[in-house]
Amino acid sequence: RVDYSSGNWSEGLTTYLADYWQVELASEDEAKEMRYGWLRNYASITDGDEKSLQAFTTRHHTASSTIGYGKSAMFFHMLRKSIGNEPFINCLKDFWLTYRYQSASFHDIRDTCQTHTNINLTVFFDSWIPTVGAPKLSANLTQTNAPERLMTINHDGKWVYPLDVEISSDANAIESTKLMRGDEITFALSVDDVKSTKIKLDPNFNIWRKLDAAELVGTLRDFIAAKQATYIQLTSDIQDGSAIISTYFMENTTYGEQTPDSNKSKKDPVIILGDIASITEHLNKSVNAIDSEHLMPISEVDFVMVSTYITNTPTLLISTPKVITDKDFSMLISRARHYGKYSWLKISPNGITEKGKWPIQEKVFSF
């Protein structure tokens, strides 16, 4: 049973063991995509909606689910990477045998795992359980006495975790794991007569962190939890698309506007409803214009929803059939809510559903 005084650990542990680990055993690529999905969900919630693991008790909305399930599952993933597979499994076995008829907390998990490792887990748990926020990774390379350079990695906080680092140059490639602790770490890097150096931090999404802008892939869930979204209706038979979208798809109300507001913050999302011609025109201006071939062709009778970025603005494009009633639109919008993890969705008149995700991009620090 869960001792809720220090947070609900069971949802995250169940997600990690019952859902994630089975995926990892079958395919590391799919496991990586699942870890990325947790981080992508985190990127879609606002700072004001974020709570600590200690404050999470049960799921109420998208933000609480992101923390209580996603962040908690990633916490156990980082714990496993910190102490190793065998100690992690033995820890869970001991924890089950000790507390199966009792209430237990994150602290009890910590104390049980501490008997299986020499790593100070108090510091690790304290950096993740009562805190909000996440590491924002950056790297810097400075020249010292040749052939050495100094590599500095900053994460904008004091979290503790093992960080995978990939360093490649003209001559060679190095993969290592560094223990992040404190504000930053600095270490010497020997690079022999190279013209350029490329660095990847956590390239496989093994830690709970803020994704770099280059790594962000648009998802429909971005708009389910969005706040202060601007609504723009171009052409459609729908009388009041803003009200329907707010009621059946989003957790918050949109701001209805007929034309874009140039003074509005580019961080605030935009929802555009129109016919196939107008939506295709906007899609061709987006960062996913090349990738959009996966959802083509779009006919005038299809319902299409696409999450993308246009001039750095999160944008949801919705194309409705040429003839549609408010009732049918409400049903389609409500159905789309179940596809939050995807980047785009297409529903044909006969009900056939196609869906997909934009390819994940890597963040590379080049020097």
Task: Describe these PLM feature segments.
Residues 63-64, 124-127, 137-140, 151-155, ...:
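Generic recognition of flexible, low-complexity loop/linker segments
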Residues 121-122, 136-202:
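Beta-strand-rich binding/interaction modules
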